[in-house]
Amino acid sequence: MSNAIKDKYTQATLCFPIKGDAVLLAEKQKKIGAGYLNGFGGKPEPTDKSIYDTNARETKEEIGISVKNARKMGEIVFHNPSEYSELRNMIVHIFTASEWDGEPIESDEMKKAAWYKITDLDFSQFLPADILFIPRILSGECVKGVIEYNDDWSIKTSSISVTSGLEDCS
């Protein structure tokens, strides 16, 4: 995707801390995905020098841990329901981390944080398209794709593929 096209999209991060066979998730309280389980992340701030900085800052803000070894495992373009005008078109950079400092603590954005066994995730507690990429990322695959939602959050179109074309996936 060219830089001119990327400029028309909101950039965001999503991080999944992993400990052994479990992933840290929490219930999102605001914006896209409110009421559903998810990892931790958000949009860049002017002080962030890279998308890795955004990932580290947002994970610290939302769950209180400082990730040490984040790996970029995915890049997905989302076309969200029209009610989210500012967040309608997004490029989400998806990370995993297996090392961090601190203990998870809840925030006003993320509640009910808990460790979930990766092989037992109940995807009825996630946004509909999450089942298309989260299991692959948590199993170590790197993915790129596009997901388009209808206004009722049903999946309109999707295309997810394994890639080696990300910084941490060569």
What are these regions (language model features)?
Residues 29-32:
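Short connector loops/turns at beta-strand edges and beta->alpha or beta->beta junctions
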Residues 3, 75-82:
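Short, solvent-exposed loop/turn elements at beta->coil junctions and helix N-caps
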Residues 137-159:
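Short, active-site-adjacent segments that bind or coordinate small-molecule cofactors and metal centers
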